[in-house]
């Protein structure tokens, strides 16, 4: 969708520029008063996909370039430290952070570790492994010394409560966590007919293979909130959200609609929607996940 692509390009650029204006102010104040500083955003990505087919409608990477002048400006583009030729939507991998919590919540509900109505009194700091020197904190506790109180899974998603997902993610375990991430297509090829990287879900084998360091339970806790070694592409995250929205079906992110003859008189190939995986779980689970995500925008 060319029109949507243009709108998304403008929206992403405007959003990043707006954030950088605020960050420039923070940096200036930090230099003047010695307060905590920040960094400017050098790039970003925006993906829009069709929920019921997985078809990408817009794939935006920022900064971008003008295709009409790319050859003339190629050396300049290559030398640009912000890498405008780098397709962040398909090639960039980033820690999903709290956007991964709906995946953890899916696993918790599907495996029967929690029910939708089960509540947990959150305590801010998870101290189960404090004797091992590890006691992670919820963001609200680290920042304000508050807790989220007694909450259920819908509220835990809405308020992005780290403690809730530390507590139950510890019981879930990394293997089940990784299993549901795979069903959602996280760390997997999307099916798009363009070069892409897959990233990876944090697992014991990945950490030990690439770092030579043994897995410890803190890695499981961090994985439950989308950290540790977990990195996915923006397109994978968009397809994952589409699967949540449509009730658990992950489609191929194909951008090929059809192939026609040279004179357009015949359709030689017509693409059909392809299902890559499906979460065969209680359909009501997706309703709770959706409600929690809705609350991020309208209730949090």
Regions found by a protein language model. Name each.
Residues 1-34, 39, 43:
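Conserved, well-ordered alpha-helix/loop/beta-strand core segments that scaffold catalytic motifs
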Residues 26-39, 44-98, 103-300:
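Beta-lactam-recognizing serine transpeptidase/beta-lactamase-like catalytic domain environment
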């Amino acid at each position: 969708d060319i029109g949507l692509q243009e709108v998304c390009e403008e929206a992403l650029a405007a959003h990043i520029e707006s954030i950088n204006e605020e960050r420039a102010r923070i940096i200036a104040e930090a230099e003047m008063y010695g307060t905590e500083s920040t960094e400017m955003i050098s790039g970003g990505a925006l993906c829009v996909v069709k929920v019921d087919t997985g078809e990408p409608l817009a794939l935006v990477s920022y900064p971008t370039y003008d295709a009409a002048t790319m050859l003339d400006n190629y050396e300049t583009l290559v030398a640009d430290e912000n890498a405008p030729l780098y397709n962040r939507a398909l090639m960039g991998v980033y820690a999903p952070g709290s956007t991964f919590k709906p995946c953890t919540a899916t696993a918790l509900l599907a495996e029967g570790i929690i029910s939708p109505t089960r509540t947990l009194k959150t305590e801010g700091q998870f101290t189960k492994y404090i004797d091992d020197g590890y006691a992670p904190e919820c963001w609200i506790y680290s920042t304000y010394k508050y807790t989220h109180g007694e909450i259920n899974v819908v509220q835990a998603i809405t308020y992005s409560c780290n403690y809730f997902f530390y507590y139950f993610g510890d019981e879930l375990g990394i293997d089940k966590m990784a299993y549901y991430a795979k069903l959602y297509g996280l760390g997997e090829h999307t099916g798009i007919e363009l070069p892409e990287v897959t990233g990876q879900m944090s697992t014991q084998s990945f950490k030990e293979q690439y770092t030579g360091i043994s897995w410890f339970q803190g890695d499981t806790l961090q994985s439950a909130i989308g950290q540790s070694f977990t990195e996915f592409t923006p397109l994978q995250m968009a397809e994952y959200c589409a699967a949540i929205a449509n009730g658990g079906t992950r489609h191929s992110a194909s951008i090929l609609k059809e192939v026609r003859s040279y004179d357009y008189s015949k359709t030689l190939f017509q693409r059909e929607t392809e299902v890559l995986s499906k979460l065969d779980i209680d359909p009501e689970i997706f309703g709770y996940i959706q409600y929690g995500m809705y609350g991020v925008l309208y209730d949090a």
